[in-house]
Amino acid sequence: MQIPETSSVHQNEWQRDVFVLSSGTCLPQQKAEVYRAHLAQIQYAWANSEISEASAVHLFKKYAEKYSAILDSDKLEIGLNNYADSILTMAKCQRNESDKWQSSLTTNNVLKLKSVQEMAEAGRRAQLSLLNSTDASVRVGNEIGTSGYSTVLAHNVLRNPSHAVPHAASSDCQIPEGSSNFLQNSKVSAFTKANTSSNTLINNSIPINTSLMQRNEVKAPTTFSTQSGPNVFSSTTSVYSGKRKACYALGDESTDIQPKPLVQRQLASKEATGDSDFKTAKEQLWVDQQKKHSNQPQRNPGPLYGGGKKSLGAARSRGLHGKFIPPLPRQEDVEDSNRKVYGQGNSEMNSTSDEHLKNIEPKMIELIMSEIMDHGPPLNWDDIAGLEFAKTTIKEIVVWPMLRPDIFTGLRGPPKGILLFGPPGTGKTLIGKCIACQSGATFFSISASSLTSKWVGEGEKMVRALFTVARCHQPAVIFIDEIDSLLSQRGEGEHESSRRIKTEFLVQLDGATTSSEDRILVVGATNRPQEIDEAARRRLVKRLYIPLPEASARKQIVVSLMSKEHCSLTEQEVEAIVLQADGFSGADMTQLCREAALGPIRSIQLMDISTITAEQVRPIAYIDFQSAFLVVRPSVSQKDLELYENWNKTFGCGR
């Protein structure tokens, strides 16, 4: 069957899409699909140099505008209404981050409130009273000035002698426009009161409500700081309620007037009393977080939408009905820590490896390192029976160049790919693994299923990540079992994702971005070599035929397997078994020995199977192999052997 050219196929698709657009029954969904197909075809044509860059930009802009007009139109007749409730419902659980997001709650808006203006007026009246008399009393009731704040501030300052008032007064805070009177008056009244009547505060000139102080210690006060963002004030409704829920504290990040958190104060009190055996989940989590972030520099958090709760006033203590905080870290924290640990670099990787892996997703690297990279026991060439020509050829072109790259340079360099084809069960997988073991290379074993994904674009990303990790672990051997399923011939009815995976694999194997110094060998094994794509066959330079084992190889398999069992076979009986097993593959010989090993077990009576010991089981005899030949048959037909031999004569590199 003659395959049509790619250009004719794309032309037919373009004409079909134009007819769909011109029809009067075309729905908006169909129009969007057509324009999306046009964009993909334009990108494909530009990538293959079929059109110029200027033409591609012009066409892409033209159809992108048409596509956007259909998506964003709110009319059901001509658009899809991209801002409909159904679309927003799908995206409502997604995190929305934006550096340009600004809150509508600003300091100027708060200062315009009536209650805040009354507080400012009360502060000015308190300032006048302080100027007239240094020993002013504090009124607690419906009208409270900032002298109440000065009482609390002075009490906190006097409790901590290290926090002197001049040190606190040296901290400057940024006062927004329009709020200078209120903040300056409050600041002047606070520190004037703290300086002139500190002794009076200790005595009884100004009464201090101890219950008020306890409540203020429990709740973390809101501070005016030099950080960017809207300043948060205490609740204005509590000013006239007679219950002070929070106090103000002036100072920037350099001041230490702020009280410690509740959990830290509780831990300190428990350690002082000696009762520190039991810790709640919240306390334990706080301790773990302090240990975790003790050596890390503090940084401003990113602008997360909904990440931090903004409120007016201090947080209300939730008590028993509060949110439960588990003592174990969250899954997001574990993933972030794992990424940080991995980002610090493995001791086996140099700086070049880190540069290669920085653009690869950590999950893909972890998948390749844990599942695709093989960590099985080592193999020797003696473990593979027969196949002397294949083993000798592989040693010459693969193993020796990897062991001595200084000698095998230039034209003596190893090939990029090897294809092992032949009947199933002849040891192709063992040869691929033995190459990695004998050359000291890292062995990657993949299949078509390990590179496919239900998400668009994930397959080619996995292929790119595989070769990137292999370049970081050179020398490396990438073994592809059943390579015909991954690199089959590309046709018209092939899925687009499968085509992209093949293209990416061929580019990584031998493309413009590959380096001749990379010591990466791709070994493919297949029992259907006629289905491999022509481009892949060209890149797999050495194509070795792995035939059925000869008589000497079959004898070696029988002797090797029977040496581990209790048997009574003579040399003549072994020769007879080998001659009778003509046409058997290596896997068939193994199955034959397994079936013969069950012969002594089948000869035991059913009533004696539970009481007989292992020493009383008779050895494996020649009659057991005769019974096994009645059950086990060759898995390769003569017709298949002729197909392999003909393909070997046409494309093979063997004798």
Curated annotation (Swiss-Prot):
Its cofactor is Mg(2+). It holds the Pfam family AAA. Gene3D superfamilies: 1.10.8.60, P-loop containing nucleotide triphosphate hydrolases. InterPro entries: AAA+_ATPase, AAA_lid_3, ATPase_AAA_core, ATPase_AAA_CS, FIGNL1_ATPase, MT-severing_AAA_ATPase, P-loop_NTPase, Spast_Vps4_C. It comes from the Eukaryota. It is an enzyme of class 3 (hydrolase). Keywords: ATP-binding, Cytoplasm, Hydrolase, Magnesium, Metal-binding, Nucleotide-binding, Nucleus. GO terms for cellular component: nuclear chromosome; perinuclear region of cytoplasm. CDD domains: RecA-like_Figl-1. Belongs to the AAA ATPase family. The N-terminus is necessary for its recruitment to DNA damage sites. May be involved in DNA double-strand break (DBS) repair via homologous recombination (HR). May regulate osteoblast proliferation and differentiation. This is Fidgetin-like protein 1. It comes from Xenopus laevis (African clawed frog).
